[in-house]
UniProtKB/Swiss-Prot annotation:
This is Putative hydro-lyase BPUM_0381. Pfam families: D-Glu_cyclase. One of its GO terms (molecular function) is lyase activity. Coiled coil: none annotated. PANTHER family: D-GLUTAMATE CYCLASE, MITOCHONDRIAL (PTHR32022:SF10). Belongs to the D-glutamate cyclase family. Keywords: Lyase. Its EC number is 4.2.1.-. The lineage of its organism: Bacteria, Bacillati, Bacillota, Bacilli, Bacillales. It comes from Bacillus pumilus (strain SAFR-032). It is an enzyme of class 4 (lyase). InterPro entries: D-Glu_cyclase (IPR009906), Putative_hydro-lyase (IPR038021), UPF0317 (IPR016938).
Amino acid sequence: MNIYQTYEPSQIRELIRKKEITGPTAGLAEGYAQANLMIVKKELAFDFLLFCQRNPAACPLLDVLEPGDPVPRKSAPKADIRTDFPKYRIYRKGILQEEVSDISAYWEDDMVAFLIGCSFTFEHALMLNDIPVRHIENGHNVPMYQTNIACKRAGVFHGPMVVSMRPIPAHQITRSVQVTSRFPSVHGGPIHIGDPAMIGIANVDQPDFGETSVIKEGEVPVFWACGVTPQAVVMHTKPEIAITHAPGHMFITDQRDQQLGVL
């Protein structure tokens, strides 16, 4: 068992601020919702808000912060999004410039932060149903892939959907769809089951983000829309600056995962 599995979200965030947790967050603070990050300048914030509204599977919004305010008052009112992710990415004109563990030096008064639901949230529910989650079992980051599925454009924002993949035993696929469909605020049910080539993935063993998960005999690759989609969109849109989380390195909110369930 991961030693941080039973920690409270505030404890995890404190350890992240202290740089004692620096890796992927799958399995941490079990039972609490996790979130992806997208930060843009205020002048682009409405376009991105509209992008999320038009692409709810990939970008389900959990929280939108006021311009210049780094405190997610809805999802974790004592947190600071500048310090409470294990790792961030700085993009300039669509190019990844660097990865950092603190964005305080990059934060500006006209920046707007968006917290987007993460599928790590429903993994606890999968495991409660005895459905294996390979990347948690093996202690690595979830594999993520850029697809040939185009997101609906909103203002300047456009680009392909990114998906995460979990190998599911064939006899448990129906149950995995039922379980995850309860959580539309964190991507909901899968968007594709089976042949990766049908959604533009040439080699499932070579993810664009994260790390490879072994697909065992009798298992089927199942794909969910992913909150790394905004990073693919940033690469296409090329804003002057955008700040995101590093894939797999999420924000732990104070919201219980079951609070986001619809059934």
